[in-house]
């Protein structure tokens, strides 16, 4: 899975889109460069016994391995993210009552809320464990990666209306990687493009945040993240939409167990420590060991 760094922590929020304000993030994070593919889900199912179902896209261009994973509910996307974490030794992002292989397990089951007694509890976001490496992007994380441009306004930074670095609608295409293009305005039967062929990039070099398939946000409709059964945000539009639905003005909400051929998702993560940080930590550790031995 390829990630792009999203920097410029503490950027100002946008006050022209939906919701208002949106897009201000006070920390560095990474955004998946591409949407999650069918192949990624199938491999995780085989190894992790996740039981995530994908919609049959035969009537929408086919079930190619590199097509986006569609028909995945928010709850199933959260299961996939948890598997990414636990399979690599990290803390799961989301809390479920039952795990794969246990009696009572269902990939469609709602999460439960992390409690103050749980390591990694974050009162500002009771959905996500702060010790997890991988997670679904929050509303602000998704919005920033799509619409914010640190070089806009003479380097001051600012927001575009579309996730291709422009206030003008992108050129509608069936696929490709040309700048200023997006996969939208296509016949329904065509279906989405492969995840690596899903149009031009955002200012942060992320592909397909406008068109191709709608993407789940981590964040619930009222932005609070304290109700497991509440509707979650989706945004970005799909291959058959008009350009307006790709814009920063549009955010819609669906039940977390909803599965639809138009819905997919991408993954975000925390960055690995930089070499400079690791060198600093190593130097501090060496100094402390020398101090204890002296």
Each language-model region and where it sits:
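Functional-site microenvironments in short loops/helix caps that host divalent-cation chemistry
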Residues: 76-247
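Short, conserved phosphate/pyrophosphate- and ester-handling motifs at nucleotide-, phospho-/glycolipid
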Residues: 37, 138, 272
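Short proline/glycine-enriched turn/loop segments at secondary-structure junctions
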Residues: 223-224, 252-259
């Amino acid at each position: 899975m390829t990630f792009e760094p999203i920097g410029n922590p503490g950027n100002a929020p946008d006050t022209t889109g939906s919701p208002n304000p949106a897009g201000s993030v006070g920390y560095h994070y990474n955004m998946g460069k591409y949407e999650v593919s069918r192949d990624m889900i199938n491999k995780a199912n085989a190894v992790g016994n996740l039981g995530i179902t994908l919609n049959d896209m035969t009537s929408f261009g086919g079930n190619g391995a590199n097509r986006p994973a569609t028909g995945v509910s928010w709850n199933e996307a959260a299961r996939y993210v948890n598997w990414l974490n636990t399979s690599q030794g990290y803390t799961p992002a989301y809390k479920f009552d039952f795990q794969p292989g246990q009696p009572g397990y269902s990939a469609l089951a709602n999460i439960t809320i992390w409690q103050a007694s749980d390591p990694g509890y974050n009162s500002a976001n009771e959905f996500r464990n702060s010790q997890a490496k991988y997670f679904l992007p929050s509303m602000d994380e998704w919005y920033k990666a799509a619409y914010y441009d640190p070089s806009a306004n003479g380097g001051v930074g600012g927001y575009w209306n579309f996730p291709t670095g422009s206030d003008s609608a992108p050129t509608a295409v069936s696929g490709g990687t040309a700048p200023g293009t997006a996969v939208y305005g296509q016949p329904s039967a065509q279906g989405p493009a492969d995840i690596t062929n899903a149009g031009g990039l955002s200012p942060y070099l992320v592909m397909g945040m406008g068109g191709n398939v709608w993407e789940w946000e981590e964040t619930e409709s009222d932005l609070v993240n304290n109700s497991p059964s509440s509707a979650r945000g989706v945004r970005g539009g799909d291959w058959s939409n008009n350009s307006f639905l790709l814009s920063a003005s549009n955010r819609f909400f669906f039940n977390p167990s909803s599965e639809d051929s138009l819905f997919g998702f991408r993954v975000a993560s925390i960055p690995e420590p930089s070499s400079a940080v690791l060198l600093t930590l190593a130097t501090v550790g060496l100094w402390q060991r020398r101090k204890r031995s002296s």
